[in-house]
Structure formats: structure tokens, C-alpha cells
A protein has these predicted regions:
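Conserved non-catalytic scaffold segment of RNase H-like nuclease domains
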Residues: 1-108, 148-156, 162
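Substrate-recognition/cap helix-loop segment adjacent to the acidic, metal-dependent catalytic center
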Residues: 101-125
Length: 181
């Protein structure tokens, strides 16, 4: 089954006040028996101002000066996202993410800034909530449910985390492990 894994890196926690810096898109074909990456894109977004929180920037480690040298305006970024969806015929493909509501809210804000309609499918599967449901049923250890904790439980390398595309790849591996349970 095809799934579109998404992740964002942002300047803070509120889409009303903070900006989307990068978007990772990872198209996968996944079943219990396999996980294959079919396509990917990593988009860097440039804004006129950032209102960056120190906490967010220390987590994602993005240098805004270097970022701005390769980043594109929100409208162009939205067009690239929609082109990725069109190219791969993903209009009805479920989204997958870890704490995906966070990413979807920032993407919605990005598309508003880009004055563009999103072509994302609205249904999604959230690996954080999948993990929490397993915790409720005592099928996995109790405790934190962040991506690092879940990835480490499954022995998935987390060293490249906090890069939108790398986080997509980690989330895809986590999703693959979760559907096996």
C-alpha cells in the first residue's frame, strides 16, 4: 500500500506565529513484509521574517543564513509539494507522520502564506497515536511516545533526526514496525 510520509522543521510550536523551514515528503510502498521508498523530496522554505524560538532552532540546528541561500519562497514550495502529489498520483493516498497534526497545521499555514490550495489527502495515520494505543494495551513499554523513543524501541537509527526528510525516513521505518504488531 502506498503512503505519503510527511514531516516539517519549524521555527517554533505555533503555526500562527512561527514558520515552516523545511518539508520532507517520502512516498513509500509498505506492507508487513516490506518497506520500499518510491520517491522523495526535501523542500527548504525562505520567509521575509522568521520569529524563531531559541528552543526550536536548537533542536533543528538550522542555520538561517545558510538556509536562505538554498530556500525558496512559500508559493514555490507549495507548487513543488503539489507537483510531487500530482506526479505520483497521491490525491487519495493516506498521509503518515509522527504527531502528524503538528505537521499538517504548519503545512496548512504554509499553503495559506503561499496563497495556494493544498492537494494533500486529509486522512492520515499517526505513528505517535498508534504507539500510544499499543501502550494502552500493554503491548509496548509505557513512557514517552516521541519519535526518538519509538525509533529506539525498534532499534532504528535516530542520529540524523530533526531534518525533515531524515525524520520521514525514520517515521516510515517506525510505521513499518508498527503495522507488524
Amino acid at each position: 500500500m502506498k503512503r505519503l510520509v510527511i514531516d516539517t522543521e519549524t521555527t517554533g510550536l505555533s503555526p500562527r506565529f512561527h514558520k515552516t523551514l523545511t518539508v520532507g515528503l517520502l512516498l513509500i510502498d509498505v506492507e508487513k513484509s516490506h518497506l520500499n521508498i518510491l520517491d522523495q523530496n526535501h523542500i527548504f522554505i525562505k520567509h521575509d521574517h522568521y520569529n524563531a524560538s531559541k528552543g526550536a532552532m536548537s533542536v533543528n540546528k538550522i542555520d538561517l543564513i545558510q538556509h536562505n541561500q538554498i530556500a525558496i519562497p512559500p508559493t514555490t514550495a507549495c507548487d513543488q509539494i503539489n507537483n510531487f502529489i500530482d506526479k505520483n498520483i497521491l490525491h487519495e493516498t493516506l498521509l503518515v507522520g509522527h504527531n502528524i497534526t503538528f505537521d499538517k497545521n504548519f503545512l496548512s499555514s504554509l499553503f495559506d502564506q503561499g496563497d495556494t490550495l493544498s492537494k494533500f489527502h486529509h486522512q492520515h495515520e499517526d505513528t505517535m497515536w498508534m504507539w500510544r494505543n499499543l501502550q494502552k494495551n500493554d503491548l509496548v513499554p509505557q513512557g514517552r511516545s516521541n519519535l526518538e523513543t519509538v525509533a529506539e524501541h525498534f532499534g532504528i537509527d535516530y542520529t540524523r533526526a530533526h531534518d525533515a526528510l531524515a525524520d520521514c525516513k525514520i517515521t516510515a521505518q517506525v510505521y513499518h514496525e508498527l503495522i507488524k504488531i
